[in-house]
Amino acid sequence: MSTLGAFSMWDLFRGEVESQMKLFTEGLLALEAGEPPAAHLASAMRAAHSIKGAARIVQLDVGVRLAHVMEDCLVGAQEAGLILTGAGIDVLLAAGDLLSRLS
């Protein structure tokens, strides 16, 4: 049996959420610190997108919906000029914390 075979899908989901949440959080904290947004928005959006896909695989519908809303907020900031304030970033970070707890 391969090492990967010893893990359940939930174990893999948990690991994916953990690694992607690091990228998501780093991106949002960089935005909050006033760093140029383009790369950080893209990184955080990709992380939310990856979590959405992982949640879909384990059929965690609430996780899919939450990650989708997070992704939409970041795409809005990228493409439509939505400005993420400190309060908005805090909400996204709280949503990320919730996804971590769901995993």
Regions from the PLM with identified roles:
Residues M1-S103:
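N-terminal assembly/transducer modules of large multi-domain enzymes
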